[in-house]
Amino acid sequence: MSDVTTAEFNEEGKYLRKVRSFVLREGRLTKGQAQAMEQQWPSMGLDYTPEAIDLVEVFGREADTVLEIGFGMGGSLVEMAKASPELNFIGIEVHKPGVGACLSVAAEAGVTNLRVYHHDALEVLENSIAEGSLARVQLFFPDPWHKKRHHKRRIVQAPFAELIRSKLKVGGVFHLATDWENYSEHMLEVMTAAPGYKNQSATGDVVERPEHRPLTKFEARGHRLGHGVWDLMFERV
């Protein structure tokens, strides 16, 4: 579930209020998660500040940076970081047990190219990430808010697409994935209408799951049951 507060607008684009696109269910940390938070946070954790971070200073090198919004328990994010040591990875997650789990798995995997925020993603994106600094932004399996009256809570809306674009460098990619077909249609509609993006799909809709996105256990089970997953990739132009 994605950890973002997103703005609600009326049909004329007038700002109404902010609504949560996630439900905060703060569970207790396991002993291992708590230990990981204590031991790994100094090296992998990023404390939120309202100023843009210096990526070279944070990672100690110049490299393309990938940011994931709402990484859950972090297994896939760590897998991606381990598979692509030439890239920098930043994950944002509002649920503390997920952050602890991610840090634990990252330490076990020995990755050094991953940093994580335990904070609201919209605030991080707006204030802590410099414009034009990201090579890729990932939003995998956000809450679909499948009831129609809750669609306004979906994170993928026009203002959000505009915010993501401002943080991507030219040629950078916004990669979305969902296992809810109606949400994939909503994503496609929003992203197609968003200025300054080019759909990487040759057919103008979805793409095959790229190799860089690991197949999750949940997703693999869904495949066996005949459930679909839809990937969308839009490039900043």
From Swiss-Prot:
State the source organism's domain of life.
Bacteria
What EC identifiers does the entry list?
2.1.1.33
Protein's gene: trmB
One Pfam family, short name please? Methyltransf_4
Q: What is this protein called?
A: tRNA (guanine-N(7)-)-methyltransferase
Q: Name one GO molecular function term.
A: tRNA (guanine(46)-N7)-methyltransferase activity
What organism is recorded for this protein? Answer: Shewanella piezotolerans (strain WP3 / JCM 13877)
Record-annotated disulphide pairs: none
Query: Which InterPro entries would you find in this protein's record?
Result: SAM-dependent_MTases_sf, tRNA_(Gua-N-7)_MeTrfase_Trmb, tRNA_methyltr_TrmB_bact
Sites binding S-adenosyl-L-methionine sit at: 68, 93, 120, 143
